[in-house]
């Protein structure tokens, strides 16, 4: 049996304390993001203006990617997949909200532009988060990344062309 020297005990206690603090800080950070997510979802239910709704959904989508990355980092793939599904639904809803406004995105790009910029930024975050997940889940992340890219492309087309159904010569 190995004798416990006072120096070894001290190192063991320090290592245990550091590990405990690290685990606590991860859960506190995640709970803050979840708290913020609930707050934004609450704001969304009270808002009727399409541009304001879209801006709130952009915040929600950013939080969902953050939570998905944290869950993937912690090895909680099922939870990460749920956040990914919520993200997919959120960006689809934001896109649909803006398209239903009937506004000319060429003349009034508010909301359209915000959503397009955020989707472009979020695509790289999705790729990074996908690398943290297991192989099976990476396909789902790639599918959602392509969805974000497609919506972003549609928004650019809508903003640049006066008639989004027309083709540029």
Positions of PLM-derived features:
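Bacterial N-terminal signal peptides that target proteins for export
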Residues: 3-18
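Hydrophobic h-region of N-terminal signal peptides that target proteins for export
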Residues: 20-28
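Long, charged/polar, soluble alpha-helical segments
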Residues: 30-169
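General helical secondary-structure elements
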Residues: 5-9, 28, 49
